[in-house]
Amino acid sequence: MPFALLKFGLNDDYPYEREPDIPAPRDLKSHYDVVIIGGGGHGVATAYYLAKYHGVTNVAILEKAYLGGGNTARNTAVIRSNYLTPEGVKFYSASVKRYEQLSNEFDFNIMYSQRGQLTLAHTDATVRAFRQRAEVNKHFGGRTELIDRQAIAELVPTLNLDPADLPVLAGLWHRDGATARHDAVAWGYAKGATQRGVELHQLTEVTDILKEGNKVTGVVTNRGRIQCNSVVQAVAGHSALLARKAGFELPLVAYPLQAMVTQPVKPFLNPLVSSSALHCYVQQTSRGEIVIGGGSDPYPLYSSRSSLELKESLIAHAIEMFPFMSEMRLLRQWAGITDMTTDYSPIMGLSPIENYYIDAGWGTWGFKATPICGWTMAELVASGGRVPDLIQPFALERFSRFQQVNEMGATAASH
């Protein structure tokens, strides 16, 4: 290693100019085959899979701010598949499998760390519900099991098993639970897409949707008009507003979702620990910081500002689980905007507008679905609207057909 450093130090060409991973923006073309609205994880993943596996490269990603700067940058990077319904378990399990291979596929380290997730049960009713979830997960290949207090103590020795009002009775242990660097995921997909000819246009806001009859023909942006054959909507918390511009309604309500992080400390917590009764989850990052999150704010609001009220609530509940955390200092707090459905499942697939495809309703669980969402949306677009089997249960029509996919019981702390 020292000889390699010496060689570079004596080289006249070092440091050398290197090509940027993501090319600088260019002028908008007048026409694209596909326009993807939203430059977050889902948007760039869809573009990546369109280009790599379907040969569709005349694609423009339009992002009103910057790459991965919305909910992709604001989530707490939890990856899991221990959901309640067969539809949900199959979908998120497929996403976990893709996450496991992303670093190799990108040749780019997304810092994927599979450390397991532990969800605490504080009542007999929750224990029964967890037993059902464990069996559903096992049936579809997930590594999930119900464990007792002794096993919990061995997994997380620092956890307080006897909070004053809510003693821990059991836990749902999900071995596939993991984390990854959310910005690395977005950049990996964007790099792979742009290297194959996809254009990423940041600071480009879509202000209107162009239609002829019931068919989308293009979009209007702050940089001009673009004609296109298809549009993919992937704008997270602003999904209902954009759909309204296209001429239809989505059954979504936007809520702020807050999280916070402490000063870094020595490693003491390997698994991700959550409690739906306490409305709180805690994890330790690779840098030693403690990330604390919980449920969405109780009021609908398009705001990404944090609040003292939720800060006090989350900190109190985190200290119930780990009392020694009262000695730590809080570094920062932030919020994102979630687009919640009534059944806590996404809306994916066709819309009432021809060639206008929906990727919405991700609430607090969008990051963990990024790879499989991009894969299935790319297949949907490339096939001209043939909905993949995996996302058929998440169609918009399920609300009018009373075929909801109820995952509310599996989103511990609304996550």
Q: Residue spans of the language-model regions?
A:
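Extreme N-terminal leader/targeting segments of oxidoreductases
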Residues: 1-34, 52-57
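Active-site lid/adjacent beta-loop-alpha segment flanking the redox-cofactor pocket in flavoenzymes
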Residues: 264-357
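Dinucleotide-binding Rossmann-like beta1-alpha1 core, especially the glycine-rich loop
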Residues: 76-158, 279, 309, 317-322
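Glycine-rich FAD pyrophosphate-binding loop
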Residues: 51-72
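C-terminal catalytic lobe of FAD-dependent flavoproteins
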Residues: 319-415
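Central helical "cap/lid" subdomain
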Residues: 221, 225-270
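Glycine-rich Rossmann-fold phosphate-binding loop(s) that bind the pyrophosphate
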Residues: 39-42, 64
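Flavin (FAD/FMN) cofactor-binding and adjacent substrate-gating region
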Residues: 2-10, 101, 113, 122-196, ...
